[in-house]
Amino acid sequence: MRVTSLSLSHFRNYERALIEPDAGVTVFTGPNAQGKTNILEALHLCCLGKSHRTSRDEELIQWGRDSARVTVKTAQRDGTHEVAVVLSRTQRKKKTVRIGLRQAERIGELLGHVCGVLFSPEDLQIVKDGPAERRRFMDMQLSQLRPAYFYALQRAVRTLNQRNALLKDIARNPSLLPTLDMWDEQLARVGAVICENRREAVGRLDELARAAHLSLTGGREELRLRYVSQVADAPDAYEALLARLSRARSEDLRRMTTTVGIHRDDIAITIDGKEARTFASQGQQRSAVLSLKLAQLELAGAESGEAPILMLDDVMSELDPSRRRQLIERIDRVQTFVTCTDLSDLAGARQGAVYRVENGVLTRT
């Protein structure tokens, strides 16, 4: 897959912009706080239907404007495609998606049309932070590649919220207790779908990340990933989740919240058998995240059947020369969008399009 054009209208600090990227590397350079990251954010919006920086879509609309639009055109094996995301402050529907000439009924229909992997300095939190950050990493990867997973995840969140609301209602009205069985069954059923997808994906990412990390470290360190779940090893995830919910019912009723399930999942990340979050140095943690992102890129290509785009947001300056060289070797294989303040960070990379960014204005150099 190759992005042939990206157009922005009233998006963040861009009045209007048209980008015709190189088939290889396209670089956006300039001082900080000029709008470089906003371009990658626009691409990410067309990949996943949401920003990687904020959950508030209205923040993406240019100040003083009622709406914003991002359009991406791509060339793929089966022809050319176009997707557009329109955000509005004033319309009843705040976000709409167009796929070609058709308006999508659901945001999830966007998934899979533009496949991309974003790597930013904030991704270090995948290793450093708690389980929620690693679940987010899993869910964003799988939602993009498997729309059915995205819809299952939406159902799981709704069902969990409804079960938690019922637990609070039961505290006030114990006669509602029998209705809990229905929600347990629904939560276990959709949870099993999530669990099985996560288990399989983490297994594949483990192999790919391990190989990438061995290459990055010259064979000196072994990175491993392991899916951590209350039912990770169960042959039947549905039955195991249902049993866990049954055993936890008294505690759930006492605390008025669901204490077991997929919302407690995690990925254990280890280097040479030691937990990377606790025992790895900052440099080792950066290497681990880079290996994860390279694995994510490989998995996305294998699952989608198309080479995904790679978005690098000011990460070159964060890497030492060895890691930078390893990453540059790999970006030659896919279409890559890079933001940086200094072009020397990309020494050795294949030359492509370069845009100078100043206060939301792009100049191709």
Predicted segment positions?
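Conserved NTPase motor "head" modules and their coupling/switch loops across ABC/AAA+ ATPases, GTPases
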Residues: 1-31, 45, 57, 173-309, ...
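Conserved lysine of the Walker
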Residues: 36
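Nucleotide-state sensing region of NTPase/ATPase domains
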Residues: 47-133, 137-145, 149, 203-211, ...
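Structural recognition of the conserved hydrophobic beta-strand(s) that form the central parallel beta-sheet
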Residues: 72, 335-342
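Structural motif
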Residues: 118, 309-311, 337
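Walker B catalytic acidic pair
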Residues: 313-315
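Long, charged N-terminal accessory/stalk domains
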Residues: 125-126, 132-181, 185-188
